[in-house]
Amino acid sequence: MRIEIKLLPLQDNPVIPFNYNYELYSQIVEKAGAIEPRIVKLLESPHGYWTFSRIIIRKREIIPEKGIKILSDDISLYISSSNKEIIKGIVEGIEKSPEFKIGDVGFLVADIKALKSKEIKNVNIFSTLSPIVVRTVKFEGDKLKHWDLYPHDELFLDRLRKVMLLRYHEVMGDLPEDKDFRIELIKFKPTRLIVKDSYIRGSLMVFRYYGSKEIAKFGYENGFGEKTNLGFGMVKIIEEQ
């Protein structure tokens, strides 16, 4: 299930920071938890029971070293999960407390609407609404460190497959019948964001997906890759001409 939240800035000439994922995540979890405390554990789970998009600003100006100046009347945030109780808790929490703060800018929720589900096929074109994060671990000296992977890295697809199967099993309770898929990269842009106190590198991508419909549907609903609950891995479907 997927929703769109319209937000109205409460200040003139609003400028939001480039790094806002953790602020949004914390406020969404707090609002939903105030209504339905039992879903907080799911919202905080690293297995990614849900995902959300970057803030969609249809008219904007990038101000280097400062942030994004909002030139449109409103902005949009998309949230998705295969778990209807999660979406219900988020919606009810936001309706009860319809204010958000991003950086120094306050926002008021103007509208929340459910979006129609798209048909998932064996071949789909996906475009990211937030960067896809795929990581591995490597030794540097005597220390084990996380290493972020991009689509051109040899380990990217293998690691993405493993992550999606692990998350599918944890969230859905079993494994998909068809476990195999591959992707064909169409467009790619690397990103680096600060989440809490850590740098996370991800991939904004347009890609053609081939294979398991179950994993495709799971990724569409809950996000592709890792850290989806922190606002990574959300995709939309592009209709092929």
UniProtKB/Swiss-Prot annotation:
UniProt entry keywords in alphabetical sequence: Antiviral defense, RNA-binding
Record InterPro entries: Cas_Cas6_C, CRISPR-assoc_prot_Cas6, CRISPR-assoc_prot_Cas6_N_sf
SS bonds (residue pairs): none
Highest taxon listed in the record's lineage: Archaea
GO molecular function: hydrolase activity, acting on ester bonds; RNA binding
Regions annotated as coiled coil: none
GO biological process: defense response to virus
Assembly information from the UniProt record: Binds crRNA.
PANTHER family cross-referenced by the UniProt entry: CRISPR-ASSOCIATED ENDORIBONUCLEASE CAS6 1
Role summary: CRISPR (clustered regularly interspaced short palindromic repeat), is an adaptive immune system that provides protection against mobile genetic elements (viruses, transposable elements and conjugative plasmids). CRISPR clusters contain sequences complementary to antecedent mobile elements and target invading nucleic acids. CRISPR clusters are transcribed and processed into CRISPR RNA (crRNA), also called psiRNA (prokaryotic silencing) in this organism (Potential).
NCBIfam families associated with the record: cas_cas6
Family membership noted in the UniProt record: Belongs to the CRISPR-associated protein Cas6/Cse3/CasE family.
Name the record gives this protein: Putative CRISPR-associated endoribonuclease-like protein Cas6
Gene for this chain: cas6b
